[in-house]
């Protein structure tokens, strides 16, 4: 852990934060979870904190040497839209101000590959910014705030990590919904299924976050992706093989799928209820989302789980005999 004495995991009650806390416990790293929501697994390590409330931040960050910021509004359908900016952007401003006021010189920020938007080729850290939604736009704004914080002094350390979509046991996001549909045997493949998808396994990204504690002062930017990328067809084959099922995917033309998505958007707007299908989710599903990192090789990191093994572990624990 080097010179650091105590780590604050802001937004640490969630999926990535809990997996990170598991590793901190194993490695005897002193940490506090700062979150609006009480940590179910590590209640004794938790303190209430809201990144939009500067007073609660500065009070609870006192005594820490390094901040890992995992807090974010990230779902597709956050309302009002201003919440993305209140949490992701104003939260970044508050964290940077608190860090300066408390003389904390080290910040690790989890951004997102959403800052690149839809990509047509494998995209590394030099990719062009073109976020298509408010999540990506707010993450990009937050990055600029952290960059300005770092540039204000020569002795600071800023690690900005842009993970691709994260999955693992216990997560109930878009990847879980995809795995569940495939595992159910009632999966409709919209499009050809040849689009490649980059993913990141939660235990691997947690291990990388631990690894960042040893980084020296300076600026560090890394896309986090577990390679190799699978096409949707390959991914479904891995899942069906794991479950011992026959691959029986029904394929639907893209134009039919996207029209269905717009129909669900209308129903959702009329009913005021979130529905499992939307046009944006179908666009994401059918898009080629392929990312890589040119920078990660500089940090001597080896992910503990190969991607195929991580998928099999997740599918086995979530869907086997269910």
Language-model region placement:
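Conserved Rossmann-fold NAD(P)-dependent oxidoreductase catalytic core, especially the SDR/UDP-sugar
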Residues: 94-134, 154
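NAD(P)H-binding glycine-rich loop region in Rossmannoid oxidoreductase-like domains
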Residues: 40, 51-90, 98, 116
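Substrate-positioning beta->alpha
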Residues: 171-177, 191-213, 220
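Glycine-rich Rossmann NAD(P)(H)-binding loop
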Residues: 168, 190-195, 222-230, 240-243, ...
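Conserved C-terminal active-site "lid" loop/helix of NAD(P)H-dependent oxidoreductases
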Residues: 202, 237, 260-301
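Mid/C-terminal beta-alpha module of Rossmann-like enzyme folds, strongest
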Residues: 212-276, 307-322
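Active-site Tyr-X1-5-Lys
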Residues: 132-159
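N-terminal Rossmann NAD(P)H-binding glycine-rich loop of SDR-like oxidoreductase domains
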Residues: 8-26
């Amino acid at each position: 852990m080097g010179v650091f004495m105590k780590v604050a995991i802001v937004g640490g009650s969630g999926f990535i934060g809990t997996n990170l806390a598991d590793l901190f416990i194993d490695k005897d790293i002193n940490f506090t979870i700062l979150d609006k929501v009480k940590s179910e697994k590590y209640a004794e390590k938790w303190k209430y904190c809201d990144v939009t409330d500067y007073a609660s931040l500065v009070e609870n960050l006192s005594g820490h040497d390094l901040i890992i910021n995992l807090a974010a509004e990230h779902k597709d359908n956050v309302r009002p839209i201003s919440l993305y900016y209140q949490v992701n952007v104003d939260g970044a401003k508050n964290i940077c101000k608190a860090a300066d006021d408390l003389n904390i010189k080290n910040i690790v920020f989890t951004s997102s590959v959403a800052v690149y938007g839809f990509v047509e080729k494998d995209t590394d850290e030099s990719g062009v910014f073109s976020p298509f939604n408010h999540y990506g736009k707010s993450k990009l704004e937050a990055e600029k705030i952290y960059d300005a914080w770092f540039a204000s002094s020569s002795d600071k350390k800023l690690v900005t990590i842009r993970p691709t979509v994260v999955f693992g046991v216990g997560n109930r996001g878009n990847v879980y919904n995809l795995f569940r549909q495939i595992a159910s045997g009632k999966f409709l493949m919209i499009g050809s299924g040849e689009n490649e998808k980059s993913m990141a396994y939660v235990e691997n990204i947690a291990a990388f976050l631990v690894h960042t504690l040893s980084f020296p002062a300076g600026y560090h930017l890394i896309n986090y992706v577990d390679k190799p990328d699978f096409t949707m067809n390959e991914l479904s084959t891995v899942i069906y093989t794991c479950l011992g099922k026959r691959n029986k995917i029904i394929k639907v033309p893209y134009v039919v799928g996207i029209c269905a998505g717009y129909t669900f958007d209308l129903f959702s707007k009329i009913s005021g209820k979130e529905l499992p299908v939307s046009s944006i989710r179908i666009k994401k599903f059918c898009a080629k989302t392929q990312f890589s990192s040119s920078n990660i090789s500089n940090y001597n990191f080896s992910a503990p789980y190969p991607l195929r093994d991580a998928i099999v572990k997740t599918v086995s624990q979530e869907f086997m005999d269910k």
